[in-house]
Amino acid sequence: MAVVTMKQLLESGVHFGHQTKRWNPKMKRYIFTERNGIYIIDLQQTLSYIDRAYDFVKETVAHGGTVLFIGTKKQAQEAIEEQAARVGMPYVKERWLGGMLTNFSTVYKRLQRLKELEEIEVTGGTEVRTKKEQLVLTREKAKLERTLGGIRDMSRVPSAVWVVDTKKEHIAVGEARKLGIPVVAILDTNCDPDEVDYPIPGNDDAIRSAALLTRVVADAVADGLMARAGASKAADAKPEQSAGEEPLAEWEQALLRGEGTAPAASEEQPAEEPAPAAAEAQTDAAVGTAV
């Protein structure tokens, strides 16, 4: 079954690029034609690139990786938060803070501070403080939640990033490339394809387009999580022997290894028949005795 259909792409306006005067010549190979001063993206290529990106994301997550969803423009914020939350992945929908990836150790300390403030609020620690102190803590917590709330459970840099609009998120893309983190992103006609490892040519300005492609990536994450869970169950379900089988006795195991011989049977074996000559002598003796 196809990840997404041509009809879905058309209905979401994925094929609409930017005006012809606002384009990156490197995107020429992804452009189908020009109509009314707007470039039309080749959706046949988009379909193949979607499959490629889908497989990469699925395999990454299946092997224990995480994908960071990034989209701070208004058209992408809702889809980024909704789809990332659906599959339990971190996301950034507000302003990207410089160093979120390259200086993650410092960011992680701020995440710990956010959790500390949440703990104070839950345990009622603010009640023993003055109103001014309570206000300061409340504002600090709100600010941290707004900027770092989407990555609050992220304990290390992600295995890959999904980006809506690489031009707007150029700082995030630059940090990912600096750390060697694969970038999966929508490539509009004004973007630089050299910055992206797994491009998906398409419209990054329309709400429906960004939502559709973000959902596709989230579906890939979901498939990867299912594959990971299946592999874990398979590993746990490998018994050394079948549940209903009795274990082999030690002498049986020795026979399998080619050591020793089987022990004598417990039942008494019948006596061997005497040789013909001995039998004849016994008969003569018996006759003599009788006489």
UniProtKB/Swiss-Prot annotation:
InterPro entries referenced in this protein's UniProt entry, alphabetically: Ribosomal_uS2, Ribosomal_uS2_bac/mit/plastid, Ribosomal_uS2_CS, Ribosomal_uS2_flav_dom_sf
Keywords recorded for this protein, A-Z: Ribonucleoprotein, Ribosomal protein
Gene: rpsB
Family stated for the protein in its record: Belongs to the universal ribosomal protein uS2 family.
Name of this protein: Small ribosomal subunit protein uS2
GO cellular component assignments: cytosolic small ribosomal subunit
UniProt lineage: Bacteria, Bacillati, Actinomycetota, Actinomycetes, Frankiales
One MF term in the entry's GO annotations: structural constituent of ribosome
Chain residue ranges for the region called Disordered: 256-291
Keyword Ribonucleoprotein (UniProt): yes
Biased composition (Low complexity): 261-291
One of the GO biological process terms: translation
